[in-house]
């Protein structure tokens, strides 16, 4: 696969696509987008290079896809996190597939407070982007998605952007809590073995 010819996917390319109803995706500038599976599942038929951090939670059904040429399967209660610059390709989704998604620009990621050992977490996610969440963790992700989306739709609010950014910061702290429950601890002995 010639990486030069792989289409890049960012927030603006999805919002401005003629295949997508722009009213089904809630955004702030080119920094944050929240959407559901019905919004973008069939947008691209081939591989795409991500320009954003994408977080997805499968609510129903299942899907198969690959990230950087590695195959993965996602089923109900499963979360996937695809990092900027990774190449993702949708393979197949069951007819009953439903999911919720967050997309965050690289520039916004750089402004978020640094949480714990985030670099080690990103290295872990490059190899293990999918994991199953507990019912409580699923509810937490869904609650953030619902509330942030509600705030995104309050277009007349004076501090809409600031409120959404604050909620996203809280969401990233919650994600770090979830990762701590699922990712193996990174210790100095592990690093010395590499």
Regions found by a protein language model. Give the residues of each.
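Amphipathic, well-ordered alpha-helical segments in soluble domains
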Residues: 54-57, 140-147, 167, 171-174
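Short acidic-glycine-tyrosine-enriched beta hairpin
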Residues: 69-81
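Generic protein-terminus/edge-of-domain signal
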Residues: 1-66, 70-72
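Histidine-centered metal-chelating micro-motifs
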Residues: 80, 84-90, 109
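A hydrophobic/aromatic-rich effector-binding and dimerization subdomain
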Residues: 2-8, 14-25, 91-153, 181
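A short, compositionally biased micro-patch
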Residues: 58-60, 83, 93
């Amino acid at each position: 696969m010639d990486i030069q010819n792989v289409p890049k996917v960012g927030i603006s390319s999805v919002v401005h696509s003629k295949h997508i109803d722009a009213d089904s995706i809630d955004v702030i500038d080119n920094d944050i987008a929240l959407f559901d599976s019905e919004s973008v599942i069939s947008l691209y038929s081939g591989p795409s290079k991500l320009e954003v951090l994408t977080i997805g939670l499968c609510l129903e059904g299942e899907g198969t896809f690959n990230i950087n040429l590695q195959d993965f399967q996602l089923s109900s209660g499963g979360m996937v996190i695809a990092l900027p610059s990774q190449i993702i390709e949708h393979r197949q989704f069951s007819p009953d597939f439903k999911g919720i998604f967050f997309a965050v620009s690289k520039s916004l990621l750089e402004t978020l407070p640094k949480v714990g050992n985030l670099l080690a977490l990103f290295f872990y996610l490059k190899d293990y982007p999918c994991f199953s969440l507990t019912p409580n963790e699923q509810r937490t992700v869904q609650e953030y998605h619902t509330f942030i989306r509600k705030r995104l739709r309050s277009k007349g609010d004076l501090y809409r952007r600031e409120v959404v950014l604050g909620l996203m910061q809280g969401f990233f702290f919650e994600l770090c809590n979830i990762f701590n429950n699922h990712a193996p601890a990174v210790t100095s002995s592990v690093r010395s073995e590499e």
